[in-house]
């Protein structure tokens, strides 16, 4: 089952993708909308995209995860398919307090999809499992 972002965010990302496809840039009005919806997280997410900090890791079985190198040089795992990030801000602000719908890492993943700037890495199913298990060990 796919997790759906609130309609306004889905629509904004869709319009941004169309604009990028048409003109290879994001118009200022969409950037202002991002800032309005996400506050400082929008700027931080765009910075992560600009620094090419997002890597899409895919395996032969079709599983896909994103890794985002955060501003603190720590790598976080994001699952766009179920709207999840392993960072503490996601656990606290999104899941626990419901202050936000996305952390900056997950927003960066969605923006990098729109802008088509994800680094790509293909790994075996075992390697992907090892990556996810290593992430789990680091959390513990």
From Swiss-Prot:
GO-annotated biological processes: double-strand break repair via homologous recombination; protein stabilization
Stretches annotated zinc finger (SWIM-type): 66-114
Gene Ontology cellular-component annotations: nucleus; Shu complex
GO terms for MF: zinc ion binding
Residues passing through the membrane, by range: none
Keyword annotations: Disease variant, DNA damage, DNA recombination, DNA repair, Metal-binding, Nucleus, Zinc, Zinc-finger
Pfam families found in the cross-reference section: SWIM (PF04434)
Compartments (UniProt record): Nucleus
Tissue spec. comment: Expressed in ovary and testis.
Record note on quaternary structure: Interacts with RAD51D and XRCC3; involved in homologous recombination repair. Interacts with SWSAP1; they form a functional complex involved in homologous recombination repair and stabilize each other.
Family matches, as PANTHER family: ZINC FINGER SWIM DOMAIN-CONTAINING PROTEIN 7
UniProt similarity note: Belongs to the SWS1 family.
Record disease entry: Ovarian dysgenesis 10: An autosomal recessive form of ovarian dysgenesis, a disorder characterized by lack of spontaneous pubertal development, primary amenorrhea, uterine hypoplasia, and hypergonadotropic hypogonadism as a result of streak gonads. Spermatogenic failure 71: An autosomal recessive male infertility disorder characterized by non-obstructive azoospermia.
Function: Involved in early stages of the homologous recombination repair (HRR) pathway of double-stranded DNA breaks arising during DNA replication or induced by DNA-damaging agents. Required for meiotic progression, hence for fertility.
Name of protein: Zinc finger SWIM domain-containing protein 7
């Amino acid at each position: 089952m796919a997790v759906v972002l609130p309609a306004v965010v889905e629509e904004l990302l869709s319009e941004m993708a169309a604009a990028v496809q048409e003109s290879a840039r994001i118009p200022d009005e969409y950037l202002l909308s991002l800032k309005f919806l996400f506050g400082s997280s929008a700027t931080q997410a765009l910075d992560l995209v600009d620094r090419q900090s997002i890597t899409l890791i895919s395996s032969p079985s079709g599983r896909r995860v994103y890794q985002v190198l955060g501003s603190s040089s720590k790598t976080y795992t994001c699952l766009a398919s179920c709207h999840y990030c392993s960072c503490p801000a996601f656990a606290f602000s999104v899941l626990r307090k419901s202050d936000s719908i996305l952390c900056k890492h997950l927003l960066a993943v969605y923006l990098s999809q729109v802008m088509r700037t994800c680094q790509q890495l293909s790994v075996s199913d075992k390697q992907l499992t090892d990556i996810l298990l290593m992430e789990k060990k680091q959390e513990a």
